[in-house]
């Protein structure tokens, strides 16, 4: 199993599937289509049925039941795309067997070093096989680790028919990283009673609370004139952007928050005197606090418009997803079974809120309750990203055990 995980994962991460916030196609990038087509063929090779990829790039497949019991249909999902925060082109995965727990020089030329000082969890992986980047790209374990684990788990179940299970549905979705994953997901066609996303982080992660999330695009319009004669004429759009940011609470940013604390996060800022554009994300677990944060953004914009003119600041703000807890609580048994599955495998469940979102955040509100399970990855979205193959193997075991327990309890 370990070799299959390594082979699939290292092959998958070399395919550039970064999504693109600026694109209006579905999926937003051709790499996701290319990857989806490959997975369709490999799902067929494994032996799954009803394998298809629709016009929007969603891949679905079925592992038929091998029991006569009336078992609810369960689903397992992962996403095709990788994050846009750092380049995902020309990924060169590096395999470190029997890791010694010490610092790893990812790239000597660029002096990129993965150190225990910066990443204190690193020594806990001593003895594991870990896969890192070469220091020039992200790895793409988010979510190609989860995707690989689903593929390997389905292969394992097919080759071990003594493990009884009900009908299992598999889906791989595009554009999760930009919040569009479930936008065209056909819940009815998927046909599962509930599902699990394999899109978590370190060993034991079991998550069914997510942020409420919104994205805010701000355009600041200035007036450019020669600086020598600019008095009472120039309006500097870049300074307007700085002023807006200055009205947000400094301590309510990602770098100062944890646990259940929400934040405002400036993702990008670019422009000049004439025009500047900023993109923020707004996050909070509590719905009332979430609405208050959005209203704060609107009020800052309104005050700046009154001060500089209505055209000085233009705001586009949209909700992206909501806290899935509200939809998971009525079917809490799906969390309990995942919890029990982990315990039976000597994995200590780590239940905590997702300081982010998964496809499950939206799918839960579309009628498909979907908690999230660990994949074994660390430090997502950057050059220090890595994954433990040992913990990927444990994630596969959790998938198999969840399927087995649902059949056993039917």
UniProtKB/Swiss-Prot annotation:
Q: Which InterPro entries match?
A: ArgE/DapE_CS (IPR001261), Bact_exopeptidase_dim_dom (IPR036264), Peptidase_M20 (IPR002933), Peptidase_M20_dimer (IPR011650), Peptidase_M20B (IPR010161)
Q: Which UniProt keywords apply?
A: Aminopeptidase, Cytoplasm, Hydrolase, Metal-binding, Metalloprotease, Protease, Zinc
Q: Identify the EC number(s).
A: 3.4.11.4
Tell me the Pfam families matching this sequence.
Answer: M20_dimer, Peptidase_M20
Instruction: Give the main EC class.
Output: hydrolase
Gene Ontology biological process terms in this record: peptide catabolic process; proteolysis
Localization per record: Cytoplasm
Q: Kindly indicate whether the keyword Cytoplasm belongs to this entry.
A: yes
**UniProt-recorded name of the protein:** Peptidase T
Task: Supply the PROSITE patterns for this chain.
Answer: ARGE_DAPE_CPG2_1 (PS00758), ARGE_DAPE_CPG2_2 (PS00759)
Does the record carry Protein biosynthesis as a key word?
Answer: no
What domain of life does the native source organism fall in?
A: Bacteria
As for what it does, the entry says: Cleaves the N-terminal amino acid of tripeptides.
For this record, the Gene Ontology CC terms, alphabetical, are:
cytosol
Active site, renumbered: 81, 176 (proton acceptor)
Source organism: Bacillus cereus (strain G9842)
For this chain, the family text in UniProt reads: Belongs to the peptidase M20B family.
Alphabetized NCBIfam families for the sequence: peptidase-T (TIGR01882), PRK05469.1 (NF003976), PRK13381.1 (NF009920)
Q: Which CDD domains match?
A: M20_peptT
Cite a single GO MF annotation.
Answer: metallopeptidase activity
């Amino acid at each position: 199993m370990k070799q299959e995980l390594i082979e699939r994962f290292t092959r998958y991460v070399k395919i550039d599937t970064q999504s693109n916030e600026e694109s209006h196609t579905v999926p937003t990038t051709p790499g996701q289509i290319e990857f989806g087509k490959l997975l369709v063929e490999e799902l067929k090779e494994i032996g799954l049925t009803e394998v298809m990829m629709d016009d929007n790039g969603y891949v679905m497949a079925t592992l038929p039941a091998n029991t006569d019991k009336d078992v609810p249909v369960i689903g397992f999902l992962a996403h095709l795309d990788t994050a846009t925060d750092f380049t995902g082109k020309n990924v060169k995965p590096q395999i470190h067997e029997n890791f010694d727990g010490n610092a790893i020089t990812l790239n000597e030329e660029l002096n990129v070093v993965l150190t225990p000082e910066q990443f204190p969890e690193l020594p806990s992986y001593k003895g594991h096989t870990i896969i890192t980047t070469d220091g020039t790209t992200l790895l793409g374990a988010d979510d190609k680790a989860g995707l690989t684990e689903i593929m390997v788990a389905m292969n394992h179940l097919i080759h071990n028919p003594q493990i009884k299970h009900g009908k299992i549905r598999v889906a791989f979705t595009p554009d999760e990283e930009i919040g569009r994953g479930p936008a065209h997901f056909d819940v009815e066609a998927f046909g599962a009673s509930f599902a699990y996303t394999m899109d978590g982080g370190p060993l034991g992660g079991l998550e069914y609370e997510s942020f409420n999330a919104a994205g805010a695009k701000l355009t600041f319009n200035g007036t450019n004139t020669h600086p020598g004669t600019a008095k009472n004429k120039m309006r500097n759009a870049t300074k307007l952007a700085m002023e807006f940011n200055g009205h947000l609470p400094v301590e309510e940013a990602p770098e100062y928050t944890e646990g259940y604390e929400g934040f405002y996060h400036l993702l990008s800022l670019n422009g000049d005197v004439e025009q500047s554009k900023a993109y923020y994300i707004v996050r909070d677990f509590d719905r009332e606090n979430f609405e208050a944060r959005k209203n704060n953004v609107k009020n800052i914009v309104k005050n700046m418009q009154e001060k500089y003119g209505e055209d000085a600041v233009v705001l586009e703000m949209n909700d992206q997803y909501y806290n899935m807890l509200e939809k998971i609580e009525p079917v809490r048994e799906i969390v309990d079974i995942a919890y029990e599955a982990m315990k039976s495998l000597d994995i200590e469940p780590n239940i905590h809120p997702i300081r982010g979102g998964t496809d499950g955040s939206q799918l839960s509100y579309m009628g498909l309750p979907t908690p999230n399970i660990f994949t074994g990855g660390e430090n997502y979205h950057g050059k220090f990203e890595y994954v433990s193959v040992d913990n990927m193997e444990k994630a596969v075991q959790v998938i198999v055990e969840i399927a087995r327990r649902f059949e056993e309890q039917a």
